[in-house]
Amino acid sequence: IVAAGSLLGLAINRGNFSFPVGKVDMLTMYPLSFEEFLLSTNNETLIEKIRESFETFTPLADVYHNLALDLYKKYLVIGGYPAVVKTYLETENYDSVRAVQADISDSYIADMTKYATPNETIRSIAIFNTLPSQLAKENTKFQYAVIKSNARAKDYELSLQWLKAVGVVLENIKVTEGKLPLTVYEQLDSFKIYYSDVGLLCFKSGTFPQDVLVNSSISDRARG
């Protein structure tokens, strides 16, 4: 039997039934990485050239360098959700891409209302919708005050944990030293929160695809 679901872990925690320990193999799925995006767009040769350049510490030839930059900009807009990538490959239309991303965003919010308590839902949606503002700050550290002026960590911690548990967002914790194991040096009260998909960030921030695809210096003007 093969089963798939983004909320399987939460269903197990909330359900009143026994779990067959040792009889279920779990595999966590993530959006496509940039390398997987290149594979999906039939750019295997470019992958090999990038890998070869990295391993030999030699510059990438201009023709491959420019191609890689163009495809990376597309990846920033499209992201790695399979349905979004599939839509782009079939249509090459960014309005269609945005429509699928909107559906995914709405589906996440619908899941929050279905599986979380009413208070958790309100706070989870608030966190979810304000991430672009968090990442656009000069200091991109996650701050509860961005959600609401008088917001406190204790009021939103549970909702943030919920979003992380279902894979909607990813947490990046600051470390005081770059030594192994990194967990020993984690500064737990200083962290950043990202959407699990870069294309979703582009969509939720309201960034127009052409601003990323055409402007060569988008990183000089954009934040997040």
Question: What positions do the PLM features span?
Answer:
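Interdomain motor-coupling "hinge/lid" segment immediately C-terminal to the ATP-binding subdomain
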Residues: 5-6, 11-136
